Every structure is written in structure tokens, then in C-alpha cells.
From Swiss-Prot:
Keywords: Amino-acid biosynthesis, Cytoplasm, Histidine biosynthesis, Lyase. The active site is at 11, 130. It catalyses: 5-[(5-phospho-1-deoxy-D-ribulos-1-ylimino)methylamino]-1-(5-phospho-beta-D-ribosyl)imidazole-4-carboxamide + L-glutamine = D-erythro-1-(imidazol-4-yl)glycerol 3-phosphate + 5-amino-1-(5-phospho-beta-D-ribosyl)imidazole-4-carboxamide + L-glutamate + H(+). This is Imidazole glycerol phosphate synthase subunit HisF. Its EC number is 4.3.2.10. One of its GO terms (cellular component) is cytoplasm. The lineage of its organism: Bacteria, Pseudomonadati, Pseudomonadota, Alphaproteobacteria, Rhodobacterales.
Amino acid sequence: MLKTRIIPCLDVADGRVVKGVNFVDLRDAGDPVDAAIAYDAAGADELCFLDITATHENRATMFDVVTRTAEHCYIPLTVGGGVRSVSDVRALLLAGADKVSFNSAAVANPDVVAQAADQFGSQCIVVAIDAKTTSPGKWEIFTHGGRKPTGIDAVAFAQTVTAKGAGEILLTSMDRDGTRAGFNLPLTRAISDAVNVPVIASGGVGTLDHLVEGVTKGGASAVLAASIFHFGDYTIAQAKQHMSDAGIPMRLI
């Protein structure tokens, strides 16, 4: 049985790690390369960098962060934020990313997922879905850092992009992000049940039990968290042991 992965997420703005609450009120949680090295040493299974201020002007900053991280870290690195084209994917893979995540660009043009998967393989193409609850059992995709409603159903979109070749879904509940109230489990379960690729649950982790629930109740293949790790509430080792004790297969440190 495949092991469940724990993935610390580093939101990067202007070359620094920040952690927002509901995508605002950013806090400085340090240098991304230092944080990545620390997480690698601590036993994280993968890392995720999201460039939340991605613009043409600061792309060079992010490429530098990715290159320096890849030089020091040996766990898989997923990079997203401002990824718009196959050439963006190529540039990030060459810089040292193992996987590249589309978000808004995949909503605007799902075929970009197919183009990237055809060139580089589904195993390195992730689609990040930011969803908000609109009514019980219904979730809508928002883009541009959660500011722009799309009218697109999250479950249907997940099925569309996996059919196009996405090898993984990074699912963030925007209602829960930064709240520490736990994952949106109905959303996570609905997406996990609807697709045949791994789903990474994101948004809302406040306790180690929340990580367990993302897998046992949400059906996720991996769990992503930021603030509980960034600010020292729990270590990766504690999280892995807690999940293992709950019967979840983990790569223990």
C-alpha cells in the first residue's frame, strides 16, 4: 500500500515565506531555502512552493529560490503560482522542480494541462483547485488567489483536468484556509471519489487529528499544512507518528 505523504507548503512572496489566514494577513515565516532544508532534514515527504505574488517581474526571484532549494533538498518539490504555459513548466523543471502546478491558467484553458502532460508526463503535472462552498454539497472554483469567482463546479473541473492528464490534484478549501478548523471533509471526499489520481488535501489544519481525518474521512492521498509546522506547533515526526498510530501507512522517520 502506498504511504500517505505529509507536505509542508511554503507560500512565497517576493522570495520570502509567508503564511496567510484566508489568503490575507501575511506573516513572515522566513527564508524559503532555509525552511526547505529544515523540512527535508525533519522528514517531510515532499515540499510545495506557491509563489503567491507571481508576476513577470519576480519570476527570476522564484527561479533562484527553486534552484537553490533543489541544490540542498532531495525530497520532491512541487512549484506553483503564475504558471501559465508549457514553457513555464519547462523552465521550472529545469530550475529543479520535480512537479509543477497549474491553477488559474488551467481554469482559463484546460488544454494547457494536456499540452504539458504530453510533453513532460502526467507524473509532474499538478492542478491546484481553490474551492469555496456555495451550498451544501456544491463547491465553486475561485482563481487569482481566491478573489475571482468562476462559476465552475469544483468536482466537474477536477474530472476535466485529470482526463486532460493532470497526475495530481492539490485541493484547497478556501473557506478553511488558515482557520485551523480542519479540512473541508465533504469537499475533499467528493473530489477524491471523483478522480483516479492522488488528491492532496489543503486548507485548515490546526491539529494532528485534522491530518488523520483528511485521509480517513476525506480520502486524500497526501495532506498539506503550513502554519502548524512553520510556527512550531508540531514537528513532522510528531505528525507522522500520530497518523501511523491511527493506522495510516506512513514513511516513519
